[in-house]
Amino acid sequence: MASGILVNVKEEVTCPICLELLTQPLSLDCGHSFCQACLTANHKKSMLDKGESSCPVCRISYQPENIRPNRHVANIVEKLREVKLSPEGQKVDHCARHGEKLLLFCQEDGKVICWLCERSQEHRGHHTFLTEEVAREYQVKLQAALEMLRQKQQEAEELEADIREEKASWKTQIQYDKTNVLADFEQLRDILDWEESNELQNLEKEEEDILKSLTKSETEMVQQTQSVRELISDLERRLQGSVMELLQGVDGVIKRMENVTLKKPETFPKNQRRVFRAPDLKGMLEVFRELTDVRRYWVDVTVAPNNISCAVISEDMRQVSSPKPQIIYGARGTRYQTFMNFNYCTGILGSQSITSGKHYWEVDVSKKSAWILGVCAGFQPDAMCNIEKNENYQPKYGYWVIGLEEGVKCSAFQDGSFHTPSAPFIVPLSVIICPDRVGVFLDYEACTVSFFNITNHGFLIYKFSHCSFSQPVFPYLNPRKCGVPMTLCSPSS
């Protein structure tokens, strides 16, 4: 009820020209009211067309000076603009401004309007259509837009998932890099500590040797000085004494004088000293990274006893040593050390047969003066071929090994030359620090066997390339005739 009254009031205060609520309403003598702007425009048009002004509704002429502002209507419009229909009174399909049913669609403004809106100044001249006519067209457009948005939503969700995945990946990678950096610098600190300790030990040894020599020279010089001083004292006494004292034993004194020679002390020029050079940290770090990489392929190697080898094996199958020699006596009681096995062989194979992939293991050879280790293609059926002779340690016979002799001579065994095929080509290896622990890396597909000096920060000792692995190969250890055992290290050691 209140809603209907309100609509009627709105119709009474609506401008007949623009069909909007009156703005600055002006009233004519006939009683009709118009917006100031609308009436002014109509007055100008009427004066041009007819030479007089008339009411747009009832056509009664009026004089401009008789136009008066309608305060009462202005107050009603002002109050009406403040009034809002209650939710119960509102109708979705009715115009909020005019209360008429919304049956038209303005194409230019994209709005649903009523017939009064269509005639208003706001929509005058626009293309309007019945809502039923354009609903299907816009439904198709909106459906297509909806499908497109759903597709974009799916793409956005996929991109969001990709970003989350990339974010997690980057976080993992950075954390991995942080761990590596910490490990690298920890290794560098260990290397620096080791180098510092080693260099200080060298300096202390140098100081000890030089001071010992200088002390010896100092003692000799003190003795020489004392001898010369005594001779001078004897001569002074003779010269100051009587003739008898002067000539008594003078020949001996003269001979002593002639025999006086000063032995110059041994000197140690500082400019000839060994110059300290800082370690190549970059090179050490590269070596450390290479060693870290190959250690990912560390396998737990043990040895396998066989009838050919006479090597002594520990219970855990990790430690290998040579047998103790037998003591025999000759016909005249002479003692001899010999090995009862005629086909003496201390070499032993690892229990793992390798036919593919990458494999790494480490061998502890500390305190040993002789050893051979590496990779072997297996023992030959003929035991005589396995007797320990250097000519057998050649790649063509299935041995890719390096060895140590006399505690200092480190060598690799390559195939002999065309002229001396029976003798291996022994490659002397320059090892700054004799290894106490050796790492062996076998890459079956790449046909390479590499040896690393774990004692010296993992520097590469030697590498066999283009190896002919035509059959399974095995880790190989040989303690030689040195009584100290060699031990296969576990990955956790």
UniProtKB/Swiss-Prot annotation:
Residues annotated as binding Zn(2+): 95, 98, 117, 123
Pfam families: SPRY, zf-B_box, zf-RING_UBOX
Stretches annotated zinc finger (RING-type): 15-59
PROSITE patterns: B302_SPRY (PS50188), ZF_BBOX (PS50119), ZF_RING_1 (PS00518), ZF_RING_2 (PS50089)
Subcellular location: Cytoplasm; Nucleus
Gene3D superfamilies recorded: 2.60.120.920, Classic Zinc Finger, Zinc/RING finger domain, C3HC4 (zinc finger)
Source domain of life: Eukaryota
Zn finger spans (B box-type): 90-132
Region (Required for interaction with GABARAP and for autophagy): 185-198
Pathway(s) served: Protein modification; protein ubiquitination
N-acetylalanine: modified positions: 2
Catalytic activity: S-ubiquitinyl-[E2 ubiquitin-conjugating enzyme]-L-cysteine + [acceptor protein]-L-lysine = [E2 ubiquitin-conjugating enzyme]-L-cysteine + N(6)-ubiquitinyl-[acceptor protein]-L-lysine
E.C. code: 2.3.2.27
Domain comment quoted from the record: The B box-type zinc finger domain and the coiled-coil domain contribute to the higher and low order multimerization respectively which is essential for restriction activity. The coiled coil domain is important for higher order multimerization by promoting the initial dimerization. The B30.2/SPRY domain acts as a capsid recognition domain. Polymorphisms in this domain explain the observed species-specific differences among orthologs.
Protein name per UniProt: Tripartite motif-containing protein 5
Source organism per UniProt: Pan paniscus
Lineage, top ranks: Eukaryota, Metazoa, Chordata, Craniata, Vertebrata
Gene it is expressed from: TRIM5
